[in-house]
A protein has these predicted regions:
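A metal-dependent hydrolase metal-coordination microenvironment
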Residues: 24, 30-161, 247-250
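Short amphipathic alpha-helical segments and helix-helix/interface helices
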Residues: 59-62, 90-97, 119, 167-168, ...
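Conserved, mostly hydrophobic/aromatic
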Residues: 48, 129, 180, 215, ...
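Domain-core and long-helix interface of multi-subunit machines
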Residues: 132-136, 143-235
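Hydrophobic h-region of N-terminal signal peptides that target proteins for export
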Residues: 9-18
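Charged catalytic cores and adjacent phosphate/nucleic-acid-binding surfaces used
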Residues: 21-42, 192-278
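Short loop/turn motifs at secondary-structure junctions
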Residues: 67-68, 125, 173-177, 264-266
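Positively charged n-region of N-terminal signal peptides that target proteins for export
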Residues: 1-4
Length: 278
């Protein structure tokens, strides 16, 4: 019944979001999310708020004043991104923290040697570090191979072995959140069940739990699929929430509501950064 009601609310939510405000609209679906979170004692923090496309720390701070979903401010770090070094990262963190001392500030790391590029003292200034698995290897021109762009994959199983090892290496990095877990490029999306076997899922979840890395539930993403989510909860994983915005427009949060209710998530299932435990 709840799933049917959530589906019924989607059209209204999409229409309200199209209005252009940076704040989340007051609609039936968002009211349901608010009720479910209150009932379960869950505080939702969006840890995947990119400062780009018109989104600013100021808008993020204003957004969280308007509704129950709290915001963060996150910069991208890497050789092919604007923020490449400690001084640039510190400037970003200081500016964001000056806007709101209650808003977690972090980065998305895109180079796999990022922890050698960023000094430990700079890392200590951050509240969280997020990574995804969607950049793997280099293209022929030497630039990062971004898996959301068209790929040529001749041998899916061979590619998957390499990609799974890539996932496990990222979990060995000192990160806080693994974003969009079990992602696959569009060329392999229809092979999800055969490529993401139970064994691979179990090993990934085991390492995430061991390392204390949260698994993201991303608004608008089909990943991870229900089989992974159920296994992750049963194995004691912690979850986080993210939107992965491209601009300042609020995203449809139906995915969050669906997973919270389907998995019967409680406050104890949700990851919290050290800065909010004080």
């Amino acid at each position: 019944m709840k799933r049917m009601l959530i589906s019924f609310c989607l059209a209204a939510a999409s229409a309200a979001i199209a209005g252009g405000s940076a704040n989340y609209p007051v609609n039936a679906m968002n009211r349901m999310l608010e009720v479910e979170c209150a009932k379960r004692g869950i505080t939702i923090i969006d840890y995947h708020v990119h400062i780009r496309g018109g989104m600013t720390p100021e808008l993020a701070a204003e957004r969280e004043k308007a509704w129950i979903v709290r915001s963060s401010a996150m910069d991208n770090h890497g050789r092919e991104w604007d923020t490449k070094n400690d001084s640039q990262l510190l400037r970003f963190a200081e500016k964001a923290k000056a806007v709101s001392d209650r808003m977690p500030v972090g980065i998305q790391v895109n180079d796999r040697d990022w922890f050698r590029q960023i000094s430990p003292s700079t890392r200590e200034k951050l509240d969280f570090i997020l990574a995804d698995t969607m950049i793997m290897g280099k293209r022929a021109d030497g630039r990062d191979n971004r898996l959301w762009q068209p790929q040529t994959i001749d041998d899916p199983e061979k590619w998957m072995k390499e990609y799974f090892a890539h996932n496990m290496r990222i979990l060995d990095e000192p990160i806080s959140i693994l974003a969009n877990p079990t992602y696959l490029p569009m060329e392999l999306a229809d092979r999800y069940d055969s490529l993401w076997t139970d064994e691979r899922m179990r090993k990934l979840i085991e390492k995430a739990v061991k390392k204390g890395v949260a698994l993201e539930i991303q608004a608008g993403s089909p990943y991870p699929r229900p089989r992974f989510l159920l296994m992750a909860k049963q194995m004691g994983a912690k979850f986080s929430f993210g939107t992965n915005n491209f601009d300042s427009k609020p995203k449809d949060l139906a995915r969050w509501l669906e997973v919270i209710t389907w998995l019967d998530l409680q406050a104890s299932d949700i990851w919290t950064p050290a800065c909010l435990k004080k």
